[in-house]
């Protein structure tokens, strides 16, 4: 063997070793686990992140993600209970595989477990949902419930079939429906929108009317309360005036009563005093005192009898009667007026 052949052999050996090393060394990313197959059999020891060595061409590996990942299911057909075929453009399933469940799930469902456990299950559950509802319900009324219903159905089956695989969320895009039906739905939605706007306007008007009514009620109650307070104030003022008047009347009545009582008492005392004072002897004394103090002299037949004693009065009347009988009358002594006139005429 010459030098050239030796060099070629060494180069071949080095190349073979390099190829073997390249084939045996592999890298696992963070958030992944490596499962190994040797001769088609799954090995029981997954490897974590980092560089690892395996037997080239005999042992193979698959990287399995153990962090959150999103699987997309596209263009899923769905037939409603009315016979209308619709298509859902995309369904996103956010899931996470626990590291402790990697070996069992890969052994039972292969490293492409998501196709078996998620994709096929999505098709089945979605068709079950659509076949039980009408297009109106799927497209409008119950569309907001599809996400939650799919999530619950998937998680319920996974808890039995693949413990450790958790569904975090399901997002479903709006279904694609035939163009004619879509236009009808758009028109219907437009009419619904107009109806909702009209209903909201009516509610606003009713609310404003209710607000105005409440304002009017509050204003009326305020006016009524003010009037009531003023009325009560006037009533209190009148009651106060009445009370003052009653007090003044009572005081005046008490004063007048006391005055009348005093006058009555004084008159009663005066009468009692006069009763004891005005005896016949005292009255006789006062009469003579009055006569003695009187300077007037009365002549004629009309002298008051009250100033003459009764015995003297009788004697005076008898004397006067006798005198009048002895004297001629005045008419006889004096000539009458006619005789005097006749004598004057005869004389002339």
From Swiss-Prot:
Any coiled-coil regions, as ranges: none
Gene coding for it: ERLIN1
Family per record: Belongs to the band 7/mec-2 family.
Polar residues bias: start-end ranges: 339-348
Keyword check for Glycoprotein: yes
Annotated GO MF terms: cholesterol binding; ubiquitin protein ligase binding
Chief localisation class: endoplasmic reticulum
Region (Disordered): 325-348
Function: Component of the ERLIN1/ERLIN2 complex which mediates the endoplasmic reticulum-associated degradation (ERAD) of inositol 1,4,5-trisphosphate receptors (IP3Rs). Involved in regulation of cellular cholesterol homeostasis by regulation the SREBP signaling pathway. Binds cholesterol and may promote ER retention of the SCAP-SREBF complex. (Microbial infection) Required early in hepatitis C virus (HCV) infection to initiate RNA replication, and later in the infection to support infectious virus production.
Protein name, entry field: Erlin-1
Membrane topology category: Single-pass type II membrane protein
Tissues where this protein is expressed: Expressed in heart, placenta, liver, kidney, pancreas, prostate, testis, ovary and small intestine.
Topology feature Lumenal, residues: 29-348
GO BP annotations, alphabetical order: cholesterol metabolic process; ERAD pathway; negative regulation of cholesterol biosynthetic process; negative regulation of fatty acid biosynthetic process; regulation of cholesterol biosynthetic process; SREBP signaling pathway
């Amino acid at each position: 063997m010459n030098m050239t052949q030796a060099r070629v052999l060494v180069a071949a050996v080095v190349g073979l070793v390099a190829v073997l090393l390249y084939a045996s060394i592999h890298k696992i990313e963070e958030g992944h686990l490596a499962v190994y197959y040797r001769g088609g059999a799954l090995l029981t020891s997954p490897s974590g992140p980092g560089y690892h060595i395996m037997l080239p061409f005999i042992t193979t590996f698959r990287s399995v993600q153990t962090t959150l990942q999103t699987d997309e299911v596209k263009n899923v057909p769905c037939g409603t209970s009315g016979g209308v075929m619709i298509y859902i453009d995309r369904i996103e399933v956010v899931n996470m595989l626990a590291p402790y469940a990697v070996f069992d799930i890969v052994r039972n469902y292969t490293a492409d477990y998501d196709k078996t456990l998620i994709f096929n299950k999505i098709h089945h559950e979605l068709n079950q949902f659509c076949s039980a509802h009408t297009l109106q319900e799927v497209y409008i009324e119950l569309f907001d419930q599809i996400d939650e219903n799919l999530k619950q159905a998937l998680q319920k089956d996974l808890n039995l079939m693949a413990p450790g695989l958790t569904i975090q969320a399901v997002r479903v895009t709006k279904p694609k429906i035939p163009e004619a039906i879509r236009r009808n739905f758009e028109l219907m939605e437009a009419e619904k929108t107009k109806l909702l706007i009209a209903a909201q306007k009516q509610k606003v008007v009713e609310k404003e009317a209710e607000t105005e009514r409440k304002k009017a009620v509050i204003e009326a109650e305020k006016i009524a309360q003010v009037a009531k307070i003023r009325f009560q104030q006037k009533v209190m003022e009148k009651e106060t005036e009445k009370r003052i008047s009653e007090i003044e009347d009572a005081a005046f009545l008490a004063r007048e009563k006391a005055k009348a009582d005093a006058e009555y008492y004084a008159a009663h005392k005066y009468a009692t005093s006069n009763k004891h004072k005005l005896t016949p002897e005292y009255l006789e004394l006062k009469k003579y005192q009055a006569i003695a103090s009187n300077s007037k002299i009365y002549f004629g037949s009309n002298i008051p009898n009250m100033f003459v004693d009764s015995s003297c009065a009788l004697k005076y009347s008898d004397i006067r009667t006798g005198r009048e009988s002895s004297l001629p009358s005045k008419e006889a002594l004096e000539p009458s007026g006619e005789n005097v006139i006749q004598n004057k005429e005869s004389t002339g």
